[in-house]
């Protein structure tokens, strides 16, 4: 019986390690970032938003320093992001973004990127901004479970 348990534990450990080693972080970063950027384009659609959200767990935790310091995972985290991001679809008249660098390790990715935008607020006034940010993503089963954005 002990030998059977040891064999099962070894198979489970080997399978988890093999699955983790097979994850294509490079492809994930490129696809995730492209999907994120598409949600900010002047012609962004609900389909673009849904494609981006497909990279996230349903209970995503989302934190933007310094304004939103809570990274708690919420059962309706993805639904909350959908609601929040839907308000901003198509508000940009111009949006540019570029990855500066990225790194990854077991179930984690950091993406340093720069982005700039111009657009119109709902009151008709113009806005523009340019930022460099570091996004740290914690992955679970190949999806983003917690994201933290560090920027000024």
Enumerate the predicted regions with their spans.
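Positively charged n-region of N-terminal signal peptides that target proteins for export
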Residues: 1-4
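Short, low-complexity N-terminal intrinsically disordered segments enriched in polar/charged residues
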Residues: 9-12, 16-55
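A beta-strand edge to alpha-helix "cap/lid" segment located at domain peripheries
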Residues: 21-24, 82-152
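Short regulatory "switch" loops immediately downstream of catalytic or recognition motifs
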Residues: 33-41, 62-67, 117-120
């Amino acid at each position: 019986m002990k030998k059977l348990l040891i064999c099962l534990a070894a198979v489970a450990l080997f399978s988890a390690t093999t699955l983790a080693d097979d994850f294509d972080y490079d492809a994930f970063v490129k696809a995730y970032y492209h999907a994120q950027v598409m949600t900010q384009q002047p012609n962004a659609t609900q389909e673009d938003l849904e494609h981006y959200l497909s990279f996230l767990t349903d209970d995503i935790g989302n934190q933007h320093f310094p304004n939103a310091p809570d990274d708690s995972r919420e059962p309706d985290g993805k639904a909350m992001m959908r609601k929040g991001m839907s308000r901003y679809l198509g508000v940009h008249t111009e949006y540019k973004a570029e990855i500066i660098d990225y790194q990854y390790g077991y179930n984690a990715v950091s993406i340093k990127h720069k982005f700039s935008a111009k657009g119109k607020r709902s009151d008709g006034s113009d806005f523009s901004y340019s930022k460099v940010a570091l996004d740290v993503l914690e992955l679970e089963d190949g999806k983003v479970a917690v994201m933290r954005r560090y920027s000024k």
